[in-house]
Regions:
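CBM-like carbohydrate-recognition segments
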Residues: 1-20, 27-68, 72-89, 97-101, ...
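Extended ligand-binding groove/face enriched in aromatic
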Residues: 45-160, 168-169
Length: 309
C-alpha cells in the first residue's frame, strides 16, 4: 500500500511546501535517492534571494525552507558544489533576509505581516538541522506565543501583525499537525542537554492532550478540531499517529498513547484507494473541503516510516 501512496505522491503537482514535505517523507522512509532528486529539483528552482522550490510569483517565506533538511542531506551525501551552494543560500535567506516581526518571528509571506501555524514545520527543522538550534527555538517560541489559544489548548491558524488580531482563530487540525510534527523533528535534532528541548516536549504533549478528546469513534478528526460541524478528514490522524510513534520511540511520550495512534492510522489506511491516493484529507488546492493533497500522501509515508522505526 505504501508503495502505491509513494507513486501517487510523485505523480502529483506540488507547490514549494509540498515539494519539501515530499522530500522529507522519502528521506525519513529511507528512500535516499528519491529524497536527493526532490531536493535537487528544489535547488534547480531556487530564486535569486535563496528561496527554494520557487514556482511562479510565490511570495512565501517559510514554505521554501520545507525542503531544507533534505537539501542538507543531499549536499552532504553527494558533495555536489551546486547543492552545497543552494543549501547555503537558503540558510542565508532564513537567517538574515526573510521578513520578520519586531520579535524576530519570520512571516509566512513577504507581504501582509502574517504569522501562520504552518511555519512551525516549514522553517525550524531546517534551522535545527543546519545547527542553528537557538534560532530554531526562537522561531518556535515566537509562533507558539502568537498562536496558542489557552481556552482550547490548541493553536490558531493565522495571526496578522498589521491588524493585531487573528485572521483565522480556528484550531485547524492540519495546522496543529504541522506544529506537532515540526516540533517532533526539532526535538530529535536538538542536543539532549539543550535547555529548550523539554519545553518543546511539553508543548507537543499539550497539543496531544487537547486533540485527543476530539478523536471520532473511527479514529478520524474534524477539519477544525473543536468544531463538530466541520468536515471529517484524516490527514491530522496521520500527523497525530506520526507524532505519537516518534515520541514513543524517542522515549518522551508514554506508550499508553499508542492505541490512539493505531486508531488514527486505521482511519487513514481505510481511505487509501486503488491509485494510492489518500482520500478525505483536507484537500488541495483550496484546503476548504475533503479531497486529496500531496501533504496527505507525504504524511501517510511519514506515519508508516515512524511506525516501523
Amino acid at each position: 500500500m505504501t508503495d502505491r501512496v509513494k507513486t501517487a505522491l510523485l505523480a502529483m503537482q506540488r507547490h514549494n511546501w509540498e515539494q519539501g514535505v515530499a522530500a522529507q517523507a522519502f528521506l525519513e522512509a529511507g528512500d535516499s535517492e528519491i529524497a536527493i532528486a526532490l531536493a535537487l529539483e528544489g535547488a534547480n528552482r531556487q530564486a535569486a534571494d535563496g528561496r527554494c522550490c520557487h514556482i511562479a510569483d510565490s511570495t512565501a517565506c517559510t514554505d521554501p525552507c520545507a525542503v531544507g533538511e533534505a537539501l542538507i542531506f543531499a549536499a552532504e551525501q553527494t558533495g555536489d558544489p551546486f547543492l552545497r551552494a543552494a543549501r547555503d543560500k537558503l540558510l542565508h535567506w532564513a537567517m538574515h533576509d526573510a521578513p520578520r516581526s519586531p520579535s524576530g518571528v519570520v512571516y509566512h509571506f513577504q507581504q501582509g505581516r502574517l504569522i501562520w501555524v504552518d511555519s512551525m514545520y516549514m522553517l525550524p527543522p531546517f534551522l535545527a538541522r543546519a545547527g542553528e538550534y537557538d534560532e530554531a527555538l526562537r522561531q518556535l517560541d515566537g509562533y507558539w506565543a502568537t498562536l496558542y489559544t489557552p481556552e482550547n489548548g490548541l493553536l490558531a491558524h493565522q495571526w496578522s501583525d498589521e491588524t493585531r488580531r487573528f485572521v483565522r482563530r480556528d484550531a485547524w487540525a492540519v495546522g496543529n499537525g504541522w506544529a506537532m510534527a515540526g516540533m517532533v523533528r526539532v526535538i530529535a535534532l536538538l542536543p539532549e542537554a539543550h535547555p529548550g528541548r523539554n519545553r518543546l516536549i511539553q508543548r507537543v504533549q499539550q497539543l496531544i492532550r487537547a486533540s485527543l478528546p476530539h478523536q471520532q469513534p473511527d479514529g478520524a478528526f474534524r477539519d477544525v478540531l473543536d468544531d463538530p460541524t466541520s468536515f471529517r478528514e484524516v490527514n491530522f490522524a496521520q500527523m497525530l499517529a506520526y507524532t505519537i510513534y516518534r515520541g514513543i520511540a524517542g522515549g518522551w511520550l508514554d506508550r499508553s498513547l499508542l492505541p490512539h495512534a493505531e486508531k488514527a492510522r486505521a482511519a487513514a489506511l481505510a481511505e487509501v484507494d486503488r491509485y494510492g491516493l489518500v482520500r478525505n484529507v483536507c484537500g488541495a488546492p483550496y484546503f476548504d473541503r475533503p479531497g486529496v493533497a500531496p501533504e496527505g500522501q507525504a504524511f501517510h509515508i511519514l506515519m508508516e516510516a515512524a511506525r516501523i522505526k
